[in-house]
From Swiss-Prot:
GO biological process, one term: peptide biosynthetic process
Gene this chain is encoded by: efp
Gene Ontology annotations for the cellular component aspect, listed alphabetically: cytoplasm
PROSITE patterns: EFP (PS01275)
PANTHER family to which the protein is assigned, alphabetical: ELONGATION FACTOR P, ELONGATION FACTOR P (EF-P) FAMILY PROTEIN
Organism encoding this protein: Streptococcus thermophilus (strain ATCC BAA-250 / LMG 18311)
Name of the protein this chain belongs to: Elongation factor P
Cross-referenced CDD domains: S1_EF-P_repeat_1, S1_EF-P_repeat_2
Family classification: Belongs to the elongation factor P family.
Keywords: Cytoplasm, Elongation factor, Protein biosynthesis
GO MF annotations, alphabetized: translation elongation factor activity
HAMAP family reported for this sequence: EF_P (MF_00141)
Amino acid sequence: MIEASKLRAGMTFVTNDGKLLKVLEASHHKPGKGNTIMRMKLRDVRSGSTFDTSYRPEEKFEQAIIETVPAQYLYQMDDTAYFMNTETYDQYEIPVVNVQEELKFILENSDVKIQFYGTEVIGVQVPTTVELTVTETQPSIKGATVTGSGKPATLETGLVVNVPDFIEAGQKLVINTAEGTYVSRA
């Protein structure tokens, strides 16, 4: 059992009514009057829906034991993404709604990890950084580096990130998958 005050982003837990929830954001909130509460943004792992809620810090939940296996992203068809276990060659179908954030960072044949809760496939874990190619960005303007504000760039997966002014279309970039931000040129 884990207390609500110990839940952090990325953790998965089971509620008293059996829902499997993943913490997207968690923060302590102390109103002017009253007791401290934990405000959380959660994703229902099975349905993919996200919602905001709050819990008392002392509320207890069962921490979900999540196992991972190495896999490869194969392709997406309609509203389903297909993955293959690289050890057993078993294939898994995951609804896109459950992995839409992760799909922004991976291309076909990318290595990932499939997450299981018991025998149930619940998600995908992507590497901490990935290399993606810029498909579209504004041209560099001479002397624009003075402001240092950057410019938006569309990557080959459709992800849009803010990049420095010297980045041009066709360049490979290293992207931080946890924050969805530019790290460096590859």
